[in-house]
């Protein structure tokens, strides 16, 4: 009987110990689950925070990119306006330079034309006497030198006799009509004309004064 009682007591103690161990294991498992749950929650929160930070960073970069694009467009517009203004300035400057140059050339050359006209009249003397012949020949040589100097400065003398009348470079002082004329034609030159020519730039310094023949009306 005593052995049976001891055996039952032992079994009861083992059962209690087993139950205690089972409770301990369950408690540890519960703690572990709680820890895992907390870690999972922290990981989720950290991931969400990183995602939010990345989204904010992306928005900031996009905003900076948009601002940079706007600045580039503004600079392009500004450059285009500046370029257009510069081209207009160059065009105005070129036109002003041409105008100033024309006036300067006219002013300079006009001072020589009357003396040249006088020398031409002397050089055109018909049948000069033996005494005047050397003088007339000397004047002709001086005139050739004058013409050469003027041509080096792009100033050209023109005598349009026999050419079609051009009102832009000639001035008709008199005229006559005849069946022999199919168009207005220069038949006599009272005074030679002069023009300035440099590359494609050409303008009249003094129109030629002429007599023209015209078809009968």
Curated annotation (Swiss-Prot):
Give UniProt keywords alphabetically: Chaperone, Cytoplasm, Stress response
GO annotations of cellular component type: cytoplasm
Bias regions of kind Basic and acidic residues — which residues?
10-32
HAMAP family named among the record's database cross-references: GrpE (MF_01151)
Q: Where is this region: Disordered?
A: 1-63
The places in or outside the cell where this protein is found are: Cytoplasm
Primary location recorded for the protein, binned into one broad class? cytoplasm
CDD domains in alphabetical order: GrpE
Annotated organism of origin:
Leptospira borgpetersenii serovar Hardjo-bovis (strain JB197)
Q: Give residue spans, biased composition: Low complexity.
A: 37-63
- What Gene Ontology molecular function terms does this protein carry? adenyl-nucleotide exchange factor activity; protein homodimerization activity; protein-folding chaperone binding; unfolded protein binding
Job of this protein: Participates actively in the response to hyperosmotic and heat shock by preventing the aggregation of stress-denatured proteins, in association with DnaK and GrpE. It is the nucleotide exchange factor for DnaK and may function as a thermosensor. Unfolded proteins bind initially to DnaJ; upon interaction with the DnaJ-bound protein, DnaK hydrolyzes its bound ATP, resulting in the formation of a stable complex. GrpE releases ADP from DnaK; ATP binding to DnaK triggers the release of the substrate protein, thus completing the reaction cycle.
On whether Chaperone is a keyword of this UniProt record, the answer is: yes
Q: What PROSITE patterns would the database entry show?
A: GRPE
InterPro entries under this entry?
GrpE, GrpE_coiled_coil, GrpE_head
Query: Its gene?
Result: grpE
Q: How does it assemble?
A: Homodimer.
Q: What is this protein called?
A: Protein GrpE
Q: Per the similarity annotation, which family is this?
A: Belongs to the GrpE family.
Its BP terms in the Gene Ontology are: protein folding
